[in-house]
Amino acid sequence: MKIYIDFDDVLCETAEYFTKIAKELFGIDVPYRQVQFFNLQKSFDLNDEQYEALMKAGHLAENLLKYEETPGASEVINKWVDQGHEVFIITGRPFNSYEPSRQWLDEHHLERVPLFCV
């Protein structure tokens, strides 16, 4: 079986980290559990300039590497690979974030899983 897994907010807790960035950059304090929209610009009530700054900061290598793994994700994925399934990680992250995203996967014992930026 082929299994495709989204990176952000499936494999790792991306939105939770973005709440920290929004607070650091703009003093906007929206607790993670209160993020109501996939559109973070709307969730944090940001103007276009602020949203662009948030996205830029969130995709810096030093930030990407700090994202917490969704509990149990790597164990489940490795089990699927061990069972013979073809597993792929898919992300809408900008292509220039490929290397740190690949590093994050490798550091979380997902070296056998290909990564695709779409």
Language-model features: locations:
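Conserved aromatic-histidine-acidic binding/catalytic patches
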Residues: D6, V10, L65, R93
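Short loop/turn segments at strand-loop or loop-helix junctions that form parts
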Residues: K56
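Short, glycine/charged-enriched secondary-structure capping and boundary segments
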Residues: F18-K20, R102-L105
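Short, acidic loop-to-helix structural element flanking the phosphoryl-transfer center
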Residues: H59-I89, F95-W104
